[in-house]
Amino acid sequence: MSTTQTRISQIGTVVVPVSDQDRAIEFYVDTLGFEKRADVPFGDRYRWVEVAPAEAATTIAIAVPPPGKPAGGVETGIGLNSADVDADHADLKARGVDVDDEVSRMGDPVPPLFWFRDPDGNTLMVVESR
């Protein structure tokens, strides 16, 4: 096992598979309020689209997967920070987002959190910042 460090310094982009990039852009930008940071051709048949909350360093690439790979319905493992998880839960629910029925409160050290699903059924988590 190597003891030398790599030059990897941060998480820059995570990929979420979607069936329709335009529908995903509408959800992540118009419904969640993210910024669209990139939307460029990627090869002959694809686009590279990145979205992110306004102040975030890490982006989400919403990508159509290659043929034969599933588009959506995955547990992404993505946790989004919120200063007020209760307000965001109510707000997303009012916007018609598929959110959990209520905010989970498991007690310390786990902060209050809830999960929601994008139009392709990909699950993301909102966690209250500490």
PLM features per residue range, with description:
Residues 20-21, 82-85:
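Helix N-cap motif at beta-to-alpha junctions
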Residues 8-9, 15-58:
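Core segments of cupin and vicinal oxygen chelate
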Residues 27, 86-91:
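Short amphipathic alpha-helices within nucleic acid-binding modules
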Residues 55-60, 121-124:
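Short, charged/polar, Gly/Pro-enriched secondary-structure boundary elements
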Residues 40-42, 54, 67-68, 104-106:
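Short polar/acidic secondary-structure junctions
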Residues 2-7, 13-16, 39-40, 47, ...:
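Vicinal oxygen chelate
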Residues 54-58, 67-69, 85-87:
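Short, charged/polar surface micro-motifs in flexible loops or helix N-caps
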